[in-house]
Curated annotation (Swiss-Prot):
Keyword Membrane: no
Pfam families per UniProt: HTH_3
GO MF, one annotated term: DNA binding
Domain (HTH cro/C1-type): residue spans on this chain: 19-73
UniProt keyword Transcription present: yes
GO cellular component: cytosol
Keywords carried by this UniProt record: DNA-binding, Transcription, Transcription regulation
Role noted for this protein: May control expression of its associated restriction-modification system SmaI.
Protein's recorded name: Control protein C.SmaI
Length: 84
């Protein structure tokens, strides 16, 4: 089962990096992203610090607020492909 734990930690790290990167690309503060998404600012911060286990519905909300897709939030290549 250790492999599953490592994979899970990788996904949390990728999500954290991508949420922060897409937020910056969209010139949004955590407060602005919170307002757009309906999530609390501290929740956004905890996602970016890899402290949250995000639900599928929250992933969808974040993807819409960041003008991207759930798969792009969960892959290292998602952001690179969009930047060209």
């Amino acid at each position: 089962m250790p492999d599953a734990d490592i994979c899970f930690m990788d996904i949390k790290e990728i999500l954290a990096e991508n949420v922060r990167s897409y937020r910056n690309i969209n010139n949004l503060s955590q407060e602005q992203l919170a307002e757009i998404s309906g999530l609390h600012r501290t929740y956004i911060g905890s996602v970016e610090r890899k402290e949250r286990n995000v639900t599928l519905s929250t992933l969808i909300i974040l993807a819409k607020a960041l003008n991207t897709s759930v798969p792009k939030l969960l892959t290292r290549q998602g952001l690179k492909n969009e930047q060209g």
